[in-house]
Amino acid sequence: MKQLKHTIRKAGEKPRYQYDCRKPPLHDINDIRHMLPHRPPFLLVDRIFHRDATDVAGIKNVTMNEPFFVGHFPEEPVMPGVLIVEAMAQCSGILVLGDVPDPENYSTYFMKIDGVKFKRKVVPGDTLQFEIHLMEPIRRGVAVVEAKAFVGETLACEAVLMAQVVKNKNNK
């Protein structure tokens, strides 16, 4: 029985959505800049290629030109895990704000991060694929998502994220 559970869990750790670089993205970087307040070098999502009411999938092409590789680590560059979690959170923001008519007037703020596991190093040349699933309906502006980041078919990071959606104060 234990072996069966392990096999089922392993099968569930492959990406559910397949990115095809030959197809235009659902949202390109310009759309993403409209939806999120983040800007380079802290905008960590390049494309969204799937989105529905409960799921979003996107990618980040990790290049040697990323500013964090200057110090993390110069001889063996590795993407900081906290930035992988942030990238998953940014994808979550796109899921949560995706159907809001004026997403630029809202922000999402972390409330809680649970069960973060880093399973593989992310290095220059990797393409991170994010898959975010809304675990329950958004209530009182609070969203809870299951977030996963893959490199190829290998799970690199997973976490459960909770965030609050807040209308920006400078907007009426």
Describe the role of every protein-language-model region:
Residues 144-172:
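Mixed-charge, glycine-accented linear interaction segment located at domain edges/termini
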Residues 43, 53-57, 127-129, 144, ...:
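Intrinsic-disorder/low-complexity, polar/charged segments enriched in Ser/Thr/Lys/Arg/Asp/Glu/Gln
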Residues 2-49, 56, 162-163:
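Flexible, low-complexity linker/boundary loops enriched in proline and small hydrophobic residues
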Residues 39-79:
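Catalytic strand-loop segment that frames the active site of acyl-thioester-processing enzymes
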Residues 55-60, 125, 169-170:
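Short acidic, Gly/Pro-enriched loop/turn segments at secondary-structure junctions
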Residues 48, 113-152:
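Hydrophobic beta-sheet segments that form the core/acyl-binding groove
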Residues 2-7, 17-26, 92-131, 156, ...:
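Hydrophobic beta-strand-centered segment that forms part of the acyl-chain substrate-binding groove
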